[in-house]
From Swiss-Prot:
Signal peptide: none annotated. Monomer. It catalyses: Transfers a segment of a (1->4)-alpha-D-glucan chain to a primary hydroxy group in a similar glucan chain. It is an enzyme of class 2 (transferase). This is 1,4-alpha-glucan branching enzyme GlgB.
Length: 731
C-alpha cells in the first residue's frame, strides 16, 4: 500500500482545501480538522505545530508517535474509538519535550444564550464572555487550566491567537468562529495569567494585522500594545459605601468634585501610592468626589486619555487593574465618590486597535460622513449596530460594577447628537427624516443611561453637552436622554468672560452674570471649571484675573465662592484650588512649590477647604440645586456697583444670603434686603486675612432691622470688601 493510500485510508490527512486554509490561517473551524475525530473503527488525532520537531499522543500509559503530514500538521491513527482523554507531548528544537492538553478537544466556552444576547445587543455582562478568561476543566487525566479567548470579528477570513507562548507566530493557534455569531473562540491550555497576547486577523480586505483584544482587561505599558491576561483577586472593603450609595440620589446630595489627571497630579505615583496621597489630599480639602480624566488604556499620553484603545482595561501606566481597584476602595473608605471620564463618542485609528478590525468598518460607521470625526482624526462608533451598542453599554456597566465607579462623565456628547457636528456643508449625511440629529446615538445614550441606573442604583451619569439639546437630564421614560446631570458650559463661558474683565468695565457686562439664572433649573447642572479651561493657550484661572497679584488672588477667591454658591454641583480642575499660575501640561506635575511661598496660593487653598466644609454642612447650598424653590434674587440689577446678591434655601428651611462685590473698590454702608431681622453671621468672607486678603469685613456679622429693602421685610448695612464674596446666615 502506497503512503498516499495509507493516509487516505486512515484519514490522517484532512481534505487538501481544509489543510490549505489551515496553513494559511483562514480556516473558520480548525477544531473540525484538529483534535480527535472518529472514522469507523479508529480515531485520528491531528495537531498543528509548525515549529515542532516531534509530537506524540499520550493516551493512558501509552505513547503514540504522530506522523508529520505536511506544513506542520502531525497526525496519528489510534486503533480504537471512544477516546476519553489524552495529552500531547511536543518537542521543539533545542528544548525538552513538554506535555499539554490539546486545545482542539474542548467544547466552546460560549453558550448559545450568550451568543444570542450579544447578537441582539442585550448582553449586559459582555465582559464575562468575550475577552480572555482563565478557566479550568476537570478531565479523566486531571485538571486542565488555561485561558479561553473570544473576539468578535464577523467579516474576518481567519483569526489566530499569538503571544509569548508561541513566539508571536500566527500559525499554531487558529481560532474557530461560532456559527453565524461572528465570534471567534479558543481555549488554550497552560496559558499563564499575566501572559501577553494579540489576535492575528486575516481581514476581509486581504490585509493581515495583529490586533489588541477589544475586550482586554489589562495591557502592556504603552507604547507597547499587547493585551495581558489578568484575573482579579481583590477583596473590597467598601461595603458600607456601596450600600449607602444604592440608597442615595446624587442630584439631591452635595457634590464638590476635584478633577484629576493621574499622571500629572504628582508624577511618578502608582495607583497604590495615589490611594494614600490623593485620598488624604482630597479629604483634607473637603471635596466629596474626584473625577478622573479617562483611565481606560490609551497609547498617546498627549490625548489625556480621550483617545481610548482598550475600553475595558485601566491604564497600566500606574499599575494593575487590582491596584486601580485599591485606589477606588481607598477613596470610598474615606467617604469620597469616584467619577471617571468615559469616551464612547470616538476612538483612534491605530492599526492595532479597533479601527477596521476585521478588514471592514466594524466598530465605526461605514459611511465616512458619519464614521470619522475630522477635528480629532478619529473614528466614530456605529451606534446603530447592535453589537457595537452592546460593547459600549456593557463597558459602562463594567466600570460601575467591576471597579465600583460611582459615576461616568460622558465626553463630547454634542459630537454624538448632531450628524453635522463640526462638518462642512455637504460633509454630513442626514437622518431618515432629513434632520441633523443622530437618532442612533440618542437611542444609545438613552439605553446606556437607563441600563446603568437600573444596574447600579445611586450612580451618576454626567453629560459634557455644549448645546441646548432639550431634556438631557430628563428621564428616558419621558423622552429625555436620561443623564443625571450635564455640564453648564454657558455658565462657565459667561462667568469667565465677565471675571476676566477689568472691574471698571464689568458693569457693562452685568447680564453675563445673571443670564444663567434664566435656565438654571431647566436641567440638573454641574458648574465646571475644568481642564479644558487651562490648556491650549487659555492660561489658568489665576491668569484670567485682571490686576496685580493681590487683585488676582481676590478675584480668584471671589470666583470660587460664586461657583460654590450658584445652583449646581461644583467641579474644579487640579491646581486651580491653589491658583496655579502656569498653564497645565500633562508632561509635568503641578506647581506645588507655590504653596511653599508666603504668597497667595496658601490662602486660596485654605479658602477652598473652608468653602467645601461650609458647603457640605449647609443644605441651603445643595439640597435644592435643581428647583426654583432653592434660589431667590435679592438684587440682580445693581450693575452700577458690580454687586450681585441672592438667597439660597435648603429643604430643611435653612437660608444663606450670598453677596458678591465684583468692583475693584470697597462698598461701605451697603444696604442689603434680607428675609428676617436679627443677627446674621458672616459665614464666609473671602477677603479675610486668613485667606491673605485685606481683612475688610463686618466683624463676623451684622444686625438686620425691620427696614424693608430689595422687596424684603428686613435689611442690614454691610461693608463689602473689594472683589469679594460674603455668605451670611441667620444666627
Amino acid at each position: 500500500m502506497s503512503h498516499a493510500d495509507q493516509l487516505a485510508r486512515t484519514h490522517l490527512a484532512p481534505d487538501p482545501a481544509d489543510l490549505s486554509r489551515l496553513v494559511a490561517g483562514t480556516h473558520h473551524d480548525p477544531h473540525g480538522i484538529l483534535g480527535a475525530h472518529e472514522y469507523g473503527d479508529h480515531t485520528v488525532i491531528r495537531a498543528f505545530r509548525p515549529h515542532a520537531t516531534e509530537v506524540a499522543a499520550l493516551v493512558g500509559g501509552d505513547r503514540f508517535a504522530m506522523q508529520h503530514i505536511e506544513s506542520g500538521l502531525f497526525a496519528v491513527a489510534l486503533p480504537f474509538t471512544n477516546l476519553i482523554d489524552y495529552r500531547l507531548q511536543i518537542t521543539y528544537p533545542d528544548s525538552e519535550p513538554y506535555v499539554v492538553a490539546d486545545a482542539y478537544r474542548f467544547l466552546p466556552t460560549l453558550g448559545e444564550v450568550d451568543l444570542h444576547l450579544f447578537g441582539e445587543g442585550r448582553h449586559e455582562r459582555l465582559w464575562e464572555v468575550l475577552g480572555a478568561h482563565p478557566r479550568s476543566f476537570t478531565t479523566a487525566d486531571g485538571v486542565v487550566t488555561g485561558v479561553s479567548f473570544a473576539v468578535w470579528a464577523p467579516n474576518a477570513k481567519g483569526i489566530s491567537l499569538i503571544g509569548e507562548f508561541n513566539g508571536w507566530t500566527g500559525t499554531e493557534a487558529p481560532m474557530r468562529v461560532l456559527g453565524s455569531s461572528g465570534v471567534w473562540e479558543l481555549f488554550w491550555p497552560d496559558f499563564p495569567i499575566g501572559g501577553l497576547y494579540k489576535f492575528k486577523v486575516h481581514g476581509a480586505d486581504g490585509v493581515v494585522t495583529e490586533r489588541a483584544d477589544p475586550m482586554a482587561f489589562a495591557t502592556e505599558v504603552p507604547p507597547h500594545t499587547a493585551s495581558r491576561v489578568t484575573l482579579s483577586s481583590y477583596t473590597w472593603g467598601d461595603a458600607d459605601w456601596m450600600t449607602q450609595r444604592a440608597a442615595r440620589n446624587p442630584v439631591f446630595e452635595p457634590m464638590s468634585t476635584y478633577e484629576v489627571h493621574l499622571g500629572s497630579w504628582r508624577p511618578g505615583l502608582s495607583y497604590r501610592q495615589l490611594a494614600r496621597e490623593l485620598t488624604d489630599y482630597v479629604v483634607e480639602h473637603g471635596f466629596t468626589h474626584v473625577e478622573l480624566l479617562p483611565v481606560a488604556e490609551h497609547p498617546f499620553a498627549g490625548s489625556w486619555g480621550y483617545q481610548v484603545t482598550s475600553y475595558y482595561a485601566p491604564t497600566s501606566r500606574f499599575g494593575t487593574p487590582d491596584e486601580f481597584r485599591a485606589l477606588v476602595d481607598a477613596l470610598h473608605q474615606a467617604g469620597i465618590g469616584v467619577i471617571v471620564d468615559w469616551v464612547p463618542a470616538h476612538f483612534p485609528k491605530d492599526a492595532w486597535a479597533l479601527g477596521r478590525f476585521d478588514g471592514t468598518p466594524l466598530y465605526e460607521h461605514s459611511d465616512p460622513k458619519r464614521g470619522e470625526q475630522l477635528d480629532w482624526g478619529t473614528y466614530v462608533f456605529d451606534f446603530g449596530r447592535r453589537e457595537v451598542r452592546n460593547f459600549l453599554v456593557a463597558n459602562a456597566l463594567y466600570w460601575l460594577q467591576e471597579f465600583h465607579i460611582d459615576g461616568l462623565r460622558v465626553d463630547a456628547v454634542a459630537s454624538m447628537l448632531y450628524l453635522d457636528y463640526s462638518r462642512p456643508e455637504g460633509g454630513w449625511t442626514p437622518n431618515i427624516y432629513g434632520g441633523r440629529e443622530n437618532l442612533e446615538a440618542v437611542q444609545f445614550l438613552q439605553e446606556m443611561n437607563a441600563t446603568a441606573h437600573k444596574s447600579a442604583p445611586g450612580i451618576v451619569t454626567i453629560a459634557e453637552e455644549s448645546t441646548s439639546w432639550p431634556g438631557v437630564t430628563r428621564p428616558t421614560n419621558l423622552g429625555g436622554l436620561g443623564f443625571s446631570m450635564k455640564w453648564n458650559m454657558g455658565w462657565m463661558h459667561d462667568t469667565l468672560d465677565y471675571i476676566s474683565r477689568d472691574p471698571i468695565y464689568r458693569s457693562y457686562h452685568h447680564h453675563e452674570m445673571t443670564f444663567s439664572m434664566l435656565y438654571a433649573f431647566s436641567e440638573n447642572y454641574v458648574l465646571p471649571l475644568s481642564h479644558d479651561e487651562v490648556v491650549h493657550g487659555k492660561g489658568t484661572l489665576w491668569g484670567r484675573m485682571p490686576g496685580n497679584n493681590h487683585v488676582k488672588a481676590a478675584g480668584l477667591r471671589s470666583l470660587l465662592a460664586y461657583q460654590w454658591a450658584h445652583p449646581g454641583k461644583q467641579l474644579l480642575f487640579m491646581g486651580q484650588e491653589f491658583g496655579q499660575r502656569a498653564e497645565w501640561s500633562e508632561e509635568r506635575g503641578l506647581d506645588w512649590w507655590q504653596l511653599d511661598e508666603q504668597g497667595f496660593s496658601n490662602g486660596i487653598l485654605r479658602l477652598v477647604r473652608d468653602i467645601n466644609d461650609i458647603y457640605r454642612s449647609h443644605p441651603a447650598l445643595w439640597s435644592q440645586d435643581t428647583v426654583p424653590d432653592g434660589y431667590s434674587w435679592i438684587d440682580a440689577n445693581d450693575s452700577a456697583n458690580n454687586v450681585l446678591s441672592f438667597l439660597r434655601y435648603g429643604k430643611d428651611g435653612s437660608v444663606m444670603a450670598c453677596v458678591f462685590n465684583f468692583a475693584g473698590a470697597e462698598h461701605s454702608g451697603y444696604r442689603l434686603g434680607l428675609p428676617s431681622a436679627g443677627r446674621w453671621r458672616e459665614v464666609l468672607n473671602t477677603d479675610a486675612t486668613v485667606y491673605n486678603g485685606s481683612g475688610i469685613g463686618n466683624m463676623g456679622g451684622v444686625d438686620a432691622t425691620e427696614d424693608p429693602w430689595h422687596g424684603r421685610p428686613a435689611s442690614a448695612v454691610l461693608v463689602l470688601p473689594p472683589t469679594s464674596a460674603l455668605w451670611l446666615e441667620p444666627k
